[in-house]
Amino acid sequence: MAFLNPILHLALDTHIKTILRGFGQVMLQNNALTGLMFLIGIFYNSWQMGLGAILGNIIGAVSAVLLRYPRDDIKNGLYGFNGTLVGIAVCFYFGINILTISAIIVGAFLSTYAMHIMKKRLPAFTAPFVISAWVVILGIKLLYPASAMALPLPQDGSLNLFSAVSMGFGQVMFQGNIITGLIFFAAILVNSRNAAIFALYGSLLGGLFSLLLPLPVAIINIGFFGYNGVLCGAVLGNKKSDAFLLTTLAIILSVLLYFGFYKAGITALTAPFVLATWIALSIKSIR
């Protein structure tokens, strides 16, 4: 049976890379090393959210296999990253227990199905995560009103731009940690210098522009108004002047949309990024 060892090794290597790419694709980076660094960054800040990320990723990918979705899409992590975000979000809001594990399984499956439907019609980005997470979070709150964890509120203070920009990267995956944010930036840089530069621009511009809005500075410092800009920059960023202007527009629009969600008391997740990017791409298509 020794001849099977190379085959088993190759199969295991393929599956591991698929899962790691699923982490990388959270910020649209099809790179296993980037994904590994993202996972390390999550665990550095929270082992619970790290476990949630792994569970959501695996369930998302396995669901795609069972539903017989395109193999190349599965290998490239396209059916893992939305599940990853669902797993992190559920653990962020409710911790990890039997209830939330069940919710992650349901939410990750829904995100995979939504991804398959949406990608046929438009760039889905993280929209399947947003839809699935809204459904799961609402369901948990309705069934178990006392289950939500009490999240620490930031204290007011002066602007800390370094914190705002770094946490802008971290908050893409609910990580309010400066070191995790730096790891995330380095992870993007490993795969694409262009994406890293424009993601940095997105976090910086998002944080600075939000100063014009009636907001507590402490909320800006923890990256809440930068993380959607990180994603806009990573997706749309380009050195050409027209692309740069479009990227800038999307980043500013994502801040305004997040502000609208914030004032309305709605959990925004990455919806501002998705909506702003769809609008920017629509403008680009009619020019």
Residue ranges and their predicted role:
Residues 34-35, 185-189, 197, 202-204, ...:
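Alpha-helical transmembrane segments of secretory-pathway, organelle, and plasma-membrane proteins
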Residues 101-102, 121-128, 222-227, 264-276:
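Loop-to-transmembrane alpha-helix initiation sites
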Residues 124-180:
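Long hydrophobic alpha-helical segments that form multi-pass transmembrane helix bundles
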Residues 49, 53, 57-69, 87-88, ...:
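Transmembrane alpha-helical segments of multi-pass membrane transport proteins and ion-pumping complexes
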Residues 64, 68-78, 84-94, 184-187, ...:
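A structural feature that tracks compact, well-ordered secondary-structure segments
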Residues 1-69, 167-175, 179-191, 207-211, ...:
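N-terminal signal-anchor module of multipass membrane proteins
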Residues 46-49, 66-78, 95-101, 115-125, ...:
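Membrane-helix interface "capping/anchor" motifs
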Residues 43-55, 94-106, 165-177, 215-226:
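Structural signature of hydrophobic alpha-helical transmembrane segments
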